[in-house]
Each structure stands twice: as structure tokens, then as C-alpha cells.
């Protein structure tokens, strides 16, 4: 559901829309209708508790309707590349603490440890996850088969018992996908 009003799209709340922007405003007791024609509840969403960290920013607590709307507006196709290829290459070749390049394991850990709280909303989380996955999987230099192999090996390591995992990790250090 894409909102045609820019105010609805950015806030996700009809309460933040000026009265002149809403259709059907007046003193009637009928529920208000948005531009799509669905009925909106008359009660406003509950105010955040003062003890919560988001109390100062009421827009930070998404309503179920706003969360569903934001999820539906996420791009399904490839996102436009906003980072210059040179900057992306520099991010991949940034030396680590020992002066060596960061390896795929470092980028894999960054991808797996990313949390939604680290982002400023679903679109930013999507963008960051996409960038972290590109840094880890390197689709510019690896084939689809190599990427699938990396994902399957990681999942296998996650489900193996501890003893088998230790043997597999020792074997894996001998055979690495370079890139």
C-alpha cells in the first residue's frame, strides 16, 4: 500500500496530517477516510510510556499499519548503487588492526551480527544489510555457485554438533575461497 500523500508516507500516521489534507473532514460522526478509501479508527494510537527511550520521538514507535506500509514499500528489485564503486572497494580493502585486509569471515560476522536497532528504520536496515552482504559474498568476483556454496557451508557449520564443527573448521582453513 503506497500512500499518495507525502505526509502519510513519511509519518505513517494520519494524525500528523493537517486537516486540509484529509478528505471528508468535518463534524460528522462517520470515520475519516484516507485517499485509498479505507476507514481509519477514530482513536489515536497510545502515547509512549515516559520511561521508554523513544518517549521523546513518538514517530519512532511504528503502528502496525505504518510497519506494514513500510514493509510493502521496500524495493523488491536490485537497489540503485548509491555508493561509488571506488568507495566500496576502499571499504573492502580497509586494513585491519594488523595491517592486513579484512577477510570474508569478518564481513560475514558483521552481516550476521547486524540488528534492526542499528538502523534508522526498515529502508535503512535493508540498505545496510544489502551492503554488508555484498561485502561478505562479493558478487562482483564470485559466481552464483560459489556464493551458494558459501551459504550452504555456513548453514552446515551452524547445525553440526560441536566436535564435527571443530573438525570442519580445521579442514576449512586449508581450503579457502580467495577473493
Swiss-Prot record:
It is found in: Nucleus. Keywords: Nucleus. The keyword Zinc does not apply. It comes from the Eukaryota. GO terms for cellular component: nucleus. Gene3D superfamilies: DNA breaking-rejoining enzymes (1.10.4020.10). InterPro entries: SCAN-C2H2_zinc_finger, SCAN_dom, SCAN_sf. CDD domains: SCAN. Residues 1-107 are annotated as: Disordered. Residues 52-80 have a biased composition (Low complexity). Residues 108-166 form the SCAN box domain. May regulate transcriptional activity. PANTHER family: PROTEIN ZBED8-RELATED (PTHR45935), SCAN DOMAIN-CONTAINING 1 (PTHR45935:SF10). Interacts with ZNF202. This is SCAN domain-containing protein 1. The lineage of its organism: Eukaryota, Metazoa, Chordata, Craniata, Vertebrata.
